[in-house]
Amino acid sequence: MKRKKKEEEEEKLIVTREFAKRWRDLSGQNHWKGMLQPLDQDLREYIIHYGEMAQAGYDTFNINTESQFAGASIYSRKDFFAKVGLEIAHPYTKYKVTKFIYATSDIHVPESFLLFPISREGWSKESNWMGYVAVTDDQGTALLGRRDIVVSWRGSVQPLEWVEDFEFGLVNAIKIFGERNDQVQIHQGWYSIYMSQDERSPFTKTNARDQVLREVGRLLEKYKDEEVSITICGHSLGAALATLSATDIVANGYNRPKSRPDKSCPVTAFVFASPRVGDSDFRKLFSGLEDIRVLRTRNLPDVIPIYPPIGYSEVGDEFPIDTRKSPYMKSPGNLATFHCLEGYLHGVAGTQGTNKADLFRLDVERAIGLVNKSVDGLKDECMVPGKWRVLKNKGMAQQDDGSWELVDHEIDDNEDLDF
């Protein structure tokens, strides 16, 4: 009975949307012209769809430094989306995670970027879980109108700490974009996480870039006879990596199957709270590419999107929201509530515009309690505890002999899965 009711609810949600018919427009074929102000209803839910896939990176990331698995994924790829709450009432999240992404850095970066366990027995002293690659199953492909390959980059744990503490230098990106674009410069932190490798770690013997390109290439080859899209998503640090990754894929032709170099697929990045990525030459390179679109959702009171302030250029199309208009959120807000991804998705769900006269109205059925997942941003009358997302008993589980142990990691060999 419950399963039948669930299926009926999903069917009801599906018939109100036209993702399959409109996916090219929703993915920015025409740079979202006429779709942002006022916000197209299908696009509203489409943005939330990919925002939730970025949020999954936070929900599975182990931030407990007392755990030997700090910096790893709590969940394995099997049933991944069910475990992060994206199965029930999420009819379009019909994806399978095919690969986990790991990263390291050959320069010092803040703990909010890479987090390591205190224990000497920690799973890794060099690498962090940095995201995943997923692809629609056959049902998801039918619902979304094409085979969708998703690359989701994890964001920073405590992003506000690095605004003042991190040196925002630019470095040459010739190793990514080649001698043709030897003037392009990228933020040193984003570049290091994207390009660094460490032979000591089994997780980052190849850098994050090559891990992604290999898996995307494998999936493109597998589905070369189908209509395919590549969608990349991320928040904060993850947004910067998503922008860099999307540009890399298109600039170097990695959006084409090796056996079908004549067949390119569109690449769209949905990024939230994105800091700036590169200089004016990076923007020039980006602007000259045909198959790429980036939609930057920006909460107006959030300070992160204006960093770094000097020497950088923004790319893509901006979609402004203002969560200060929400009648559910505390006023005044603070840096954390303005920046958190769940706050952003709440803003997307209710935005009617950012002008003074524009109101806020939730046009999708999205629980307001999600805002408080990692912050304390809702008004007290909403009756939702702040920072409520924690593992049951903080991961402590009773064993058969009556003892208690920290169980906060599912083993995953990360070998290629063929769904």
From Swiss-Prot:
pH profile: Optimum pH is 5-6 with 1,3-DAG as substrate and at 30 degrees Celsius.
Localization per Swiss-Prot or TrEMBL: Cytoplasm
One Pfam family hit: Lipase_3
Keyword NADP among UniProt keywords: no
InterPro entries per the UniProt record, alphabetical: AB_hydrolase_fold, Fungal_lipase-type, PLA
Residues in coiled coil: 1-21, 207-227
One GO MF term attached to the UniProt entry: monoacylglycerol lipase activity
UniProt entry keywords in alphabetical sequence: Coiled coil, Cytoplasm, Hydrolase, Lipid degradation, Lipid metabolism
GO cellular component: cytoplasm
Function: Acylhydrolase that catalyzes the hydrolysis of 1,3-diacylglycerol (1,3-DAG) and 1-monoacylglycerol (1-MAG) at the sn-1 position. High activity toward 1,3-DAG and 1-MAG, but low activity toward 1,2-diacylglycerol (1,2-DAG) and 1-lysophosphatidylcholine (1-LPC), and no activity toward phosphatidylcholine (PC), monogalactosyldiacylglycerol (MGDG), digalactosyldiacylglycerol (DGDG), triacylglycerol (TAG) and 2-monoacylglycerol (2-MAG). May be involved in the negative regulation of seedling establishment by inhibiting the breakdown, beta-oxidation and mobilization of seed storage oils.
Family the entry assigns: Belongs to the AB hydrolase superfamily. Lipase family.
Listed name of the protein: Phospholipase A1-IIgamma
Gene: DSEL
